[in-house]
Amino acid sequence: MKERILQEIKTRVNRKSWELWFSSFDVRSIEGNKVVFSVGNLFIKEWLEKKYHSVLSKAVKVVLGNDATFEITYEAFEPHSSYSEPLVKKRAVLLTPLNPDYTFENFVVGPGNSFAYHAALEVAKHPGRYNPLFIYGGVGLGKTHLLQSIGNYVVQNEPDLRVMYITSEKFLNDLVDSMKEGKLNEFREKYRKKVDILLIDDVQFLIGKTGVQTELFHTFNELHDSGKQIVICSDREPQKLSEFQDRLVSRFQMGLVAKLEPPDEETRKSIAKKMLEIEHGELPEEVLNFVAENVDDNLRRLRGAIIKLLVYKETTGKEVDLREAILLLKDFIKPNRVKAMDPIDELIEIVAKVTGVSREEILSNNRNVKALTARRIGMYVAKNHLNSSLRTIAEKFNRSHPVVLDSVKRVKDSLLKGNKQLKSLIDEVIGEISKRALSG
């Protein structure tokens, strides 16, 4: 009876699905018209209940009659199926180290990477659903982050699965070493028998290396045929992997191919904030926005720019303003890329530096004496030294025309009354403007 039920199920699913989802599946017991199935993995149990309920229901009814029912139980030990080896066994989980910072939570999603992100997340949640998953994109766009996020997610949520993350260079070196030492069988055992999820980074490194491609081809086939999840990253799409064996390229394309596009400006700003958060650092918003707007080659350089500013801040004890950031990051920014700084934006930055009041406070509704004085100095200098229009000043300072006029008048009256402290601050602001103008 047990074999009839299993055979009936097998006829209702394709070979690939049988090997992937039913390899650890067995009939545990039959009591009257109720069948109890068992599986050795909790994820597979939930997947079968969700996706194969109808198949299982029809199969038991064909064998036991229309009143037949079933349930699926999860058992940690191996079922007694004679069909194939179980998909999952209890073993050490993480076979190679992963960067704990590379998680889905730390990955900022935007229009250019949304598809790849969700594909990777689905693979992490449901290993085998998209197999293989091939992620490609330019340098520093987040391929390694996504690849290791899959590994970190599985380690946290699927304790039965064995995860291996490797670069293709490591795969090559391991192969060469095993051949030199006469341990090729051990190499194949390691990569083909002791892995449930294989994550391969920078596969383009194997271009032109025919011997290792052949080994990878057979490794791929054995893992895939056993229902093991494979995820591959490359800097180019499969069909552009020149000097790769056609049969290997076709394997890369048989699952899901996802591209990572360069992030747009808004996504880069969000990524910059996330990087700052991970580094436990603080930078003014205008500085962070400047970095995101101008360092757009790749995310590694974006992170490098942020770290450089944080190191400067920590080692000098100085706050990093926009002008300082421009000077510090000249090697990160393409020539002629930096836009000329708006005169009033630069003025506000200078006023903040001279008075010790932050840019945010100057532009806020804070009416304490220090913030109010700094705000009025800024509007006064903008009107009388920069010759800016009332409309422009009002827009930049988030104030109405009457407020701007009143602020300018109050500063002028105070200067006429001989307020030396106010005059000193204004002179320092104007002096800094002149100095910056001369330095270009």
From Swiss-Prot:
Query: Which intervals of the chain are annotated as region Domain IV, binds dsDNA?
Result: 314-440
Task: Name the segments for region: Domain II.
Answer: 69-96
Q: Which residues form a coiled coil?
A: none
Main location as per UniProt: cytoplasm
- Region annotation (Domain I, interacts with DnaA modulators) maps to 1-69
State if Cytoplasm is listed as a keyword. Answer: yes
- What processes in GO biological process is this protein linked to? DNA replication initiation; regulation of DNA replication
Record's subcellular location: Cytoplasm
What Pfam family is a match, any one?
Answer: DnaA_N
Q: Which residues bind ATP?
A: G140, G142, K143, T144
Q: What SUPFAM superfamilies does the record tag this protein with?
A: P-loop containing nucleoside triphosphate hydrolases, TrpR-like
Keyword Ribonucleoprotein recorded: no
InterPro entries from the entry? AAA+_ATPase (IPR003593), Chromosome_initiator_DnaA (IPR001957), Chromosome_initiator_DnaA-like (IPR020591), Chromosome_initiator_DnaA_CS (IPR018312), DnaA_C (IPR013159), DnaA_dom (IPR013317), DnaA_N_dom (IPR024633), DnaA_N_sf (IPR038454)
The molecular function terms in GO held by this entry are: ATP binding; ATP hydrolysis activity; DNA replication origin binding; lipid binding
Subunit structure and binding partners? Oligomerizes as a right-handed, spiral filament on DNA at oriC.
What's noted about domains in the record? Domain I is involved in oligomerization and binding regulators, domain II is flexibile and of varying length in different bacteria, domain III forms the AAA+ region, while domain IV binds dsDNA.
Q: Which HAMAP family match?
A: DnaA_bact
This protein is called what? Chromosomal replication initiator protein DnaA
Gene behind this chain? dnaA
